[in-house]
A protein has these predicted regions:
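Noncatalytic scaffold domains of N-terminal-nucleophile
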Residues: 1-11, 15, 21-185, 190-192, ...
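Active-site rim segments in enzyme catalytic domains, especially the processed small/beta chain
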Residues: 24, 36-53, 58-60, 209-212, ...
Length: 517
């Protein structure tokens, strides 16, 4: 079974499973396809984080996170620009992550698919074109004035001077040629081959500090996932510099409350999850590259600390919310195969449309992940050469008796741990099916791109009595539309003890889950 936010990506992944490929091989195909058909949220110029697990007890995490350039510009202001060439401060590691995952699949999962074959769907859609999705059309119209000034953006994403609209056929021949180069010469051609030279020249011409040497130095890290026990399951999340431990901390705090005694979606259910988010996020600003800052993950997730955080929650009153907001968008996709080998992945160019910089003649849109750094020397995320920034991506995977039981993830930057907490409590505490859990009302705490208030954005279909009770508890409410895109786009695959599967993708988007029979 596969799930992704775009039907073409899900169909491509399913085809790999149907011809005997592993879940990892299916996920690589989805990763490359989604990089073509969802260009506003991810692409070759971005990063990705992967969690893999199987029935034999193997679990691992691949962190395809690009590092900052060896030589950085001198910034004079208080912050790094959010768009443009001065936000392109980091390399892009997602293509290298594809190779690392493919190598693992071959070595441990018996994968036999040729790497280049896994990119053929992406190449086809880039050459032949595909109908622009509602999501792409929405975000292009939203950002057209902001991004029009950056190199190559209008030439690629506008049609006769106007943004491509939903349903119009969108072709990317230059990106197709870049993918063909990777398929023919291998993933390292992105970093050390003729394609790398074209990328480096395109970045230099745009004003980015990333050089050919920076590309060549880019490597995916293979690390142990962070872990937390919850209601008989073991939850896996990527370690720092990602916010995966924030998701685990929320769940560890909630474990001290009997959620099963509450009605799912009730004001008290929502209140406890919101307050757990506040407690968990108190340490989130300390998350950074472990090569540059001490990251006491075991202390942050210790039973004593989580219990103290749970005791700090007042079931009858909302605490203040002072946490700064980080924007960003990404895509989640997941897969599991007939052998129970399972993959959970997030892939991103950080903000929607990344930096807005299209790299030379490659058709590659580069990420703006450099904007996640701080210019404050006292910050754990202070910008330094070779450093990886704080990272919002945190795909998840849950184990039952050491075997994959849930594959899950969502887009949404700060909202990712919040969405996942609501999703996991519905799936685990209330035993809801993926379709039901994904459709349930959700919230987003804090500022967003459209609302600068530190309010609790909550989907209006939670019901007026719930809204009234949350207001009585002291939450500053800002109701949003039912199944709002602000509340993220998540996906789930649930694996029952007997091996039967149930999967779905978020009704807030256009994605689908597909099963092989």
């Amino acid at each position: 079974m596969v799930t992704s936010p775009h039907p073409l990506a899900s169909a491509a992944g399913l085809a790999v499973l149907e011809r005997g490929g592993t879940a990892a091989e299916a996920a690589i195909t989805m990763a490359s396809t989604i990089a073509v058909v969802y260009p506003h949220f991810c692409g070759l110029g971005g990063d990705s984080v992967w969690i893999l697990a199987d029935r034999q007890g193997r679990q691992t995490c691949f962190m395809g996170i690009g590092q900052a350039a060896a030589k950085l510009p001198d910034f004079t202001g208080d912050s790094i620009p959010l768009r443009g060439p001065f936000s392109t401060l980091t390399s892009a590691a997602t293509v290298d992550a594809w190779e690392a995952v493919h190598r693992y699949s071959t070595e441990y999962w018996g994968g036999k698919q040729v790497f280049g074959d896994l990119l053929q769907d992406a190449i086809h859609h880039a050459h032949q074109g595909f109908p622009v999705s509602r999501s792409q059309g929405f975000w292009l119209d939203m950002r057209k004035d902001v991004l029009a000034e950056w190199p190559g953006f209008i030439n690629l994403f506008f049609n006769n001077g106007q943004p491509f609209a939903p349903g119009e056929i969108f072709r990317q021949p230059e990106l197709a040629r870049s993918l063909e180069d990777i398929a023919s010469h291998g993933p390292r051609s992105f970093y050390q081959g003729t394609l790398a030279q074209r990328i480096a020249e395109g970045l230099r011409a745009a004003g980015s500090p990333i050089t050919l040497a920076d590309l060549a130095a880019t490597r995916t890290m293979q690390v142990e996932p962070s872990r937390l026990s919850y209601r008989g399951l073991e939850l896996l999340a990527p370690p720092p510099p990602t916010q995966g431990i924030s998701t685990l901390a929320i769940m560890g705090i909630l474990q001290h409350f009997d959620l099963s005694a509450l009605t799912p979606g009730s004001a008290q259910h929502l209140h406890l999850v919101v307050e757990a988010v506040k407690q968990a996020f108190l340490t989130r600003d300390r998350i950074a590259d472990p090569d540059f800052a001490d990251q006491p993950v075991q202390e942050w997730l210790s039973a004593e600390r989580l219990q103290r955080a749970a005791k700090a929650i007042n079931p009858d009153r909302a605490l203040a919310w002072p946490h700064p907001y980080r924007t960003g968008d990404t895509v989640f996709f997941g897969a599991t195969d007939a052998s129970g080998q399972s993959v959970s992945t997030l892939q991103s160019t950080y903000f929607d449309w990344g930096s807005g910089v299209v790299v030379g003649d490659t058709g590659i849109l580069w990420q703006n992940r450099g904007a996640a750094f701080s210019l404050d020397p006292q910050s754990p995320n202070f910008l330094q050469p070779g450093k990886r920034p704080f990272y919002t991506l945190n795909p998840g995977l849950a184990l039952r008796d050491g075997k994959p039981a849930l594959i899950y993830g969502t887009q949404g930057a700060d909202g990712q741990p919040q969405t996942l907490a609501m999703l996991l409590t519905r799936l685990i505490d209330y035993a809801e099916a993926p379709t039901q859990a994904l459709a349930g009302p959700r919230f987003l705490l804090g500022k967003t791109f459209s609302d600068s208030r530190d309010s609790l954005k909550i989907e209006a279909d939670c019901g007026q009595p719930v809204l009234d009770r949350l207001a009585d508890l002291g939450h500053q409410l800002a109701p949003i539309e039912r199944q709002s895109p602000i509340a993220g786009q998540a996906g789930v695959i649930a694996i029952a003890p007997d091996g039967s599967l149930a999967g779905a993708h978020d009704p807030r988007g256009e994605g689908v889950a597909l099963a092989a029979y």
